[in-house]
Amino acid sequence: LRRTGYMGTDEFMGVRPLGFHPVPGEWYRVKVEVCGNRIRIFLNDEKQPHIDLVDKNADLVPSGEVALGGGWIETEFDDLTVTPMADDALKNVKVAEYQKKATPTEKENKRRQERASYTSAKLAALTGSRTDITLDGNWLFMPDYQLDNKDKAVSVQTNDQDWHIMSVPNFWTPIRIWLHGETMPSPTGAQPKGVSDTYYQQETDRCENYTFDYRRVKYAWYRQWLELPANVEGKNMTLTFDAVSKIAEIYINGTLATSHLGMFGEIQVDGSRLLKPGKNLITVKVTRKMDGSASESANAIDFFYSSVRESEQEDAKVEVNKDALLKEIPHGFYGDEPAGIWQPVKLTITDPVKVEDVFIKPTLNGATFDVTLKNHGSKKKQFDLYTDIIDKETGAVLYSGLSIRKLNLNADEERMETYTISDLKPRLWTPQHPNLYDFKFRLVADKGTELDCLTETSGFRTFEVKDGLFYLNGNKYWLRGGNHIPFALAPNDENLANTFMQLMKAGNIDVTRTHTTPWNKRWMTAADRNGIGVSFEGTWSWLMIHSTPIPDQRLIEIWRNEFLGLLKKYRNHPSLLFWTVNNEMKFYDNDSNLERAKEKYRIISDVVKEMRRIDPTRPICFDSNYQATGK
């Protein structure tokens, strides 16, 4: 609803979902009631209006004529009638709008059907030396307002037939992020619709259709039953949660295995001593709000956007809102306190001697490898390390050979081995030819027994800065790209990732940045495959922007550790060209306090030193920015 007004007083009044898709060729009846400062919009024969609001500026437009027309599509209007209303016609009529919501009985029936169709995760047999089982899919779910008892929530004895079903990975809240979640003013208050009616309604409907009231949930319990075969006894079993927002407590068969604070960090849980053959229960408590705060996240995105263009003269305004802006964990541009197990979950089963981590440092004719190995067992173990490099497209073997002979690891010992393979002739990775290889790292014991085999997909390419210019594979380039792409709207939609990146390629865009929020494995893998170069940004946009105070040291540590963890997680992706610390920090010439600006520099400098230690192969950009004030 938009109301025209005198001398520039036109106003956007509100937007509401129809609840159905209009059909071309059909007629729809619309009734508009205007009585004093009240406006009500009815559709067809519904008894309640779709829009019912008070126009605070009605006195500016006390009278006028009626006109028909407008719209973006060809529309026919007919049978217009105008009927006078008494001045007090709506005096005793409460403001109430039509809402199409499921009744409690309908929701309970749906919950029972979904619960009846739930099946536990099951691994029938181990597959080779390393077995990965995805735990994505339906999990049991119980909000805090229905269960506020930890012992009952985590117990394997608890009857969970009355639990809800929640998909993983997913948020249990609607995604409200920057351009798709910003508020628009209206007489009834701010409306966080953003630029897309369709997306806003899609996310709202997703959460309204849950069998619980997502608005009431402060924290929730997730449960997943998992059946394992008999021969997992004595194996190393690692649970990996790519990301949980925002606080996670993970229990295995009733025992607390680990806890984690942060929205983007990977959580690895050694479940070797807690998981067993047969039936197991994984329980996760996910908390939406820190310390009971109900308003900080809700206000943060609005303040971010309103303050990001503020100049240093408005220092006081920024500091007044420091609690709403800074005293919460990094969440990118996400607003409205997103919560849930929102990135994939898997269980990895290996021998106690395993490859823990691999860092591939490519050149144009080979690579240097940092391979971290660990013996989780109770006895010393000897083995050989082999490396295979296989073209992912053709299956051709580029290299296969023994890399290190007779390695010895004592019980519970972890060690990193470094070696180089050279004189290869690989197909290089470029945006035009995104050639990828599977790098296999095999641990082989006596008599050829394979203890572990980790496969990492990567590519051969170099990216560096020399004399102020960028060089990809030794060739000089000007760097120009476009952003941002819709990762944050659908972080687990692989089809969207591939489709959008192909559209970018069709539009001659080969480079972008992970603006608004860091990407996950699905989108980074899509960038590798589609040939999209990436500037990977940090998790805290506008950190210490302008003249804002320095955040609490605990928050700085959360940001630092989480971001450095992402470097280790994604440093093998060839599409990742360089790291960017954050988006628009801009304190370097916009902080009115020079000593505070120097301290901010020291904080960032310490993090950058760690970034260079974790990944010495890539350039680092201070922040994503544009022309500085007055420069």
Residues of each region from the PLM?
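Extended carbohydrate-recognition surfaces in non-catalytic/accessory domains of CAZymes
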Residues: L1-G5, K91-T240, V320-Q343
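Extracellular glycan-recognition regions
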Residues: L1-T103
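Beta-strand-rich interaction surfaces with strong enrichment in secreted/lumenal proteins
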Residues: R16-P22, V66-A67, Y210-Y214, Q224, ...
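Accessory beta-strand-rich segments of carbohydrate-active enzymes
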Residues: K47, L53, W72, A121, ...
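Active-site-adjacent substrate/metal-binding segments within catalytic domains
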Residues: P174-L228, V232-T240, S245-I252, T258, ...
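Extended acidic/polar, glycine-enriched regions
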Residues: R273-K279, T372-E464
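Surface beta-strand/loop "capping" patches
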Residues: I349-S378
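Extracellular glycoside hydrolase catalytic/binding regions
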Residues: D591-K631
